[in-house]
């Protein structure tokens, strides 16, 4: 599945060009991300950065986009929402990215949601299962992972119906990420 995400990304870009009736003349497609390269979940940011760069380099080295190159720009947000907002503004207004890809974290993505809703920039494969990305009617948001609610419903079903457990203890992170999981568990 992981190998298919970058392929789907490029299919999405092609369809986006087609349906927007735009001719993309630029030789470089600039894609950007704000990632936790340092801080408490730096390993997640490093994984997204490493995986995306590996595939984008493969695409560029093998001329898969017919003489167009992908430039992947990333900035460290340390999993801090305020830094994510600053990074997003830099990516959009300074770097002039065509698409946003692989942002990591529920609190960080939630902080940029009002900005994203006003723009027509594709926001592709954020690494969060938050419901706020699924509740709106924004055609520029493309999710590839399950929602936290779907994951928790499956876990509760398994524990209750398959394992016969009637009590579940809950420990959750005290932020938007943890709260969403906790509420999803109560609803399941």
Residue ranges, per PLM feature:
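N-terminal hydrophobic targeting signals that begin at the initiator methionine
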Residues: 1-3
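Immediate post-signal peptide segment of exported/extracytoplasmic ligand-binding proteins
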Residues: 19-33, 63-69, 160-166
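Short beta-strand segments enriched in small/hydrophobic residues
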Residues: 26-48, 103, 167-171
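Short, polar/charged alpha-helical segment
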Residues: 43-65, 183-188
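Beta-alpha junction/loop-to-helix N-cap segments that form part of ligand/metal-binding clefts
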Residues: 44-50, 64-132
């Amino acid at each position: 599945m992981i190998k298919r995400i970058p392929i789907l990304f490029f299919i999405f870009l092609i369809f986006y060009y087609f349906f927007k009736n735009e001719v993309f003349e630029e030789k470089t497609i600039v894609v950007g991300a704000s990632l936790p390269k340092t801080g408490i979940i730096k390993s997640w940011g490093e994984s997204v950065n490493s995986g995306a760069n590996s595939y984008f380099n493969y695409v560029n080295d093998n001329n898969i986009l017919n003489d167009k190159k992908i430039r992947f720009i990333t900035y460290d947000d340390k999993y801090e929402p305020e830094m994510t907002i600053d990074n997003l503004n830099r990516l959009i207004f300074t770097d002039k990215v065509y698409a946003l890809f692989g942002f990591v974290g529920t609190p960080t993505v939630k902080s940029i949601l009002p900005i994203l809703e006003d723009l027509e920039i594709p926001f592709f494969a954020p690494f969060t299962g938050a419901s706020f990305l699924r509740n709106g009617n924004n055609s520029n948001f493309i999710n590839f992972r399950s929602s936290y609610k779907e994951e928790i419903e499956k876990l509760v079903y398994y524990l209750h119906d398959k394992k016969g457990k009637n009590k579940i203890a809950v420990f959750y992170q005290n932020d938007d990420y943890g709260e969403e999981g906790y509420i999803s568990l109560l609803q399941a």
